[in-house]
A protein has these predicted regions:
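General helical secondary-structure elements
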Residues: 98-100, 108, 166-172
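Conserved phosphate-binding/catalytic loops in two-lobed NTP-binding clefts
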Residues: 84-105
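Short, surface-exposed amphipathic charged segments that create phosphate/polyanion-binding patches used
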Residues: 101-115, 133-137
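A short linear-motif detector with a strong N-terminal bias
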Residues: 40-42, 97-99, 110
Length: 179
């Protein structure tokens, strides 16, 4: 892999009922194949998607729809059939040409960071570095770009409410009289 080639990033975020976003985990690798080789420890993008689906049960995977990502969609569909696992919901998102990548990232993330709505682990070094060096001269913006896509489509859970003390709880459906 060339030193300056882009990274593939798969990121998992959680959203609380009060719309705080927590970065749970991410994979950031250069020259990652679309699908790993069975029997070897090297996983591909689609393998990581199945792994994250099992671990985090995301409601949606957002995949940047570019010429380079077309094989991901084809492989994901065939792997779903092969594994008989259709638990992965995904959205193909075109980057758009209305604004630059840097402006798009800033539009999505800047306000949320400024009000303290996005929370990272101290051990997420690559993401911390990309956030603190964000700008026209930064070497890589792949992790922060993945975070922007995740945040753009992340919504708080719908079935949540607050009790009298202000604690969040999951609302339970009430039984109805059908007679």
């Amino acid at each position: 892999a060339r030193r300056d080639s882009d990274f593939s990033v798969i990121i998992a975020v959680a959203v609380t009922p009060d719309n705080n976003i927590y970065v749970l985990d991410y994979v950031r690798k250069q020259s990652i194949p679309v699908l790993g080789i069975p029997g070897e420890s090297k996983l591909g993008i689609v393998d990581y998607m199945f792994q994250y689906a099992k671990s985090y049960k995301p409601s949606l995977f957002t995949v940047e729809d570019t010429t380079m990502s077309k094989p991901i969609f084809q492989t994901l569909k065939s792997e779903m059939r092969r594994r008989n696992d259709f638990s992965i919901g995904y959205k193909e998102e075109k980057p758009g040409t209305r604004m630059s990548k840097r402006d798009r990232i800033q539009e999505i993330l800047a306000q949320r960071f400024s009000i303290g709505q996005i929370h990272l682990k101290k051990t997420q070094y690559d993401l911390h570095r990309e956030i603190t060096t964000f700008g026209p001269r930064m070497a890589h913006d792949d992790t922060i770009d993945a975070l922007a896509y995740a945040v753009k489509f992340a919504n708080p859970p719908l079935a949540a409410g607050k009790d009298k003390e202000g604690n969040w709880y999951k609302k339970k459906p009430k039984a109805r009289d059908w007679v």
